[in-house]
């Protein structure tokens, strides 16, 4: 009986720990989500009008619904992370953790077209060079949200 409780108690503790930790195991961090949704460093902006249709799909922004607007940044991750130590500005939602890039960056804006309807999401692709504004968080401070381009 004593041996049985010696085995059961540690197993119970292990199960409780796994149940508590499990929900966070598959959860994407805000920084990882920012990179998935907004970074396209390895590529110069494509001149293809189909760029947004392909990227929005392969970056999982058309699952369950069409994300109406998204911006891809075509600069190095290091350059985008550096924005978190540049000009501090107020975010669109009033928070104070946004930063504006010192220099313009190559970006592609993707906007859902009027004919777009889930599951056939359709986007207009527009390439521009603008300053980006990102919300930063964590230690070290890294981009966690794309706020705007100006």
UniProtKB/Swiss-Prot annotation:
Active site per UniProt: 38, 145
Q: Name one GO biological process term.
A: defense response to Gram-positive bacterium
An annotated Gene Ontology molecular function: lyase activity
Q: In which tissues is it expressed?
A: Seminal plasma. Can reach 3% of the protein content of this fluid.
How activity is controlled: the entry says:
Allosteric regulation by both substrate and reaction products.
User: Where does the signal sequence lie?
Assistant: 1-26
* Primary localization: secreted
Deamidated asparagine PTM sites in chain numbering? 93
Keywords annotated in UniProt: Allosteric enzyme, Disulfide bond, Endonuclease, Hydrolase, Lyase, Nuclease, Secreted, Signal
Please state where this protein is localized: Secreted
Which one Pfam family would you cite for this protein?
RnaseA
Query: Which Cys pairs does UniProt list as disulfide-bonded?
Result: 52-110, 66-121, 84-136, 91-98
A GO cellular component annotated for this chain's UniProt record is: extracellular region
Stored SUPFAM superfamilies: RNase A-like
- Give the EC number(s) under which this enzyme is classified: 4.6.1.18
What this chain does, per the entry, is described as: This enzyme hydrolyzes both single- and double-stranded RNA.
Further facts: Progressive deamidation of Asn-93 transforms the homodimer (beta- 2) into and heterodimer (alpha-beta) and finally a doubly deamidated dimer (alpha-2).
Q: Assembly state and interactors?
A: Homodimer; disulfide-linked.
Family (UniProt): Belongs to the pancreatic ribonuclease family.
The family database entries (PANTHER family) matched by this protein are listed as: RIBONUCLEASE (PTHR11437), RIBONUCLEASE PANCREATIC (PTHR11437:SF24)
This one is known as: Seminal ribonuclease
Naturally occurring in which organism (per UniProt): Bos taurus
Q: What gene is behind this protein?
A: SRN
């Amino acid at each position: 009986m004593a041996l049985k409780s010696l085995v059961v108690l540690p197993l119970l503790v292990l199960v409780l720990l796994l149940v508590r930790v499990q929900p966070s195991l598959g959860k994407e961090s805000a920084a990882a989500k920012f990179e998935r949704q907004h970074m396209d460093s390895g590529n110069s902006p494509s001149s293809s009008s189909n760029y947004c249709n392909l990227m929005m799909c392969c970056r999982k922004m058309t699952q369950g619904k069409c994300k109406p607007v998204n911006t891809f940044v075509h600069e190095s991750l290091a350059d985008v992370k550096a924005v978190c130590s540049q000009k501090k500005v107020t975010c669109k939602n009033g928070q104070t953790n946004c930063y504006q890039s010192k220099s313009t960056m190559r970006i592609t804006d993707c906007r859902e077209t009027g004919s777009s309807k889930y599951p056939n999401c359709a986007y207009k692709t527009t390439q521009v060079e603008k300053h980006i504004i990102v919300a930063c968080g964590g230690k070290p401070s890294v981009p966690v949200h794309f706020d705007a381009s100006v």
